[in-house]
Amino acid sequence: MERTLTILKPDCVRKQLIGAVIDKIERAGFRVVAMKKTKLTTETAGAFYAVHRERPFFGELVEFMSSGPCVPMILEKENAVEDFRKLIGATDPAEAEEGTVRKLYADSKGENIVHGSDSEENAQIESSFFFSTEEAVRVNN
């Protein structure tokens, strides 16, 4: 069973879409292994997105991700990383396929509702950023 990390971003929380997005995730066959509501500081957002430090959008991304509460979650499913990326759609909601999370709920490329890990390796790294081993308990059945 593969795992991936998602973050329901501050715009998702602000628009009161947490339940709708989690419903879509669960209906797609994902199991929520761990979940918490938290607020990132600019420092923690910067550390999480450090891979983008040299990109022109880094400052705006950090500012946005620290603008309000977010909901990181570890999800589990066969082929979790790839399937979740398909479920959420393209980064830019204008380019996302119909029915995807971003097409349904996102306003812009910058405020696009949800983060999803882009590889199994990054999913493990990102999951450990938010959750301890004890919090990321194995789901049975």
UniProtKB/Swiss-Prot annotation:
Top-level division of the source organism's lineage: Bacteria
Principal subcellular localization: cytoplasm
A UniProt-annotated Pfam family: NDK
Reaction equations catalysed: a 2'-deoxyribonucleoside 5'-diphosphate + ATP = a 2'-deoxyribonucleoside 5'-triphosphate + ADP; a ribonucleoside 5'-diphosphate + ATP = a ribonucleoside 5'-triphosphate + ADP
Intracellular or extracellular location(s): Cytoplasm
Enzyme class: transferase
The UniProt record lists the keyword Ion transport: no
Gene Ontology MF annotations: ATP binding; metal ion binding; nucleoside diphosphate kinase activity
Record: active site: 115
Entry-linked Gene3D superfamilies: Nucleoside diphosphate kinase-like domain
Family membership: Belongs to the NDK family.
Protein name: Nucleoside diphosphate kinase
Gene assigned in the entry: ndk
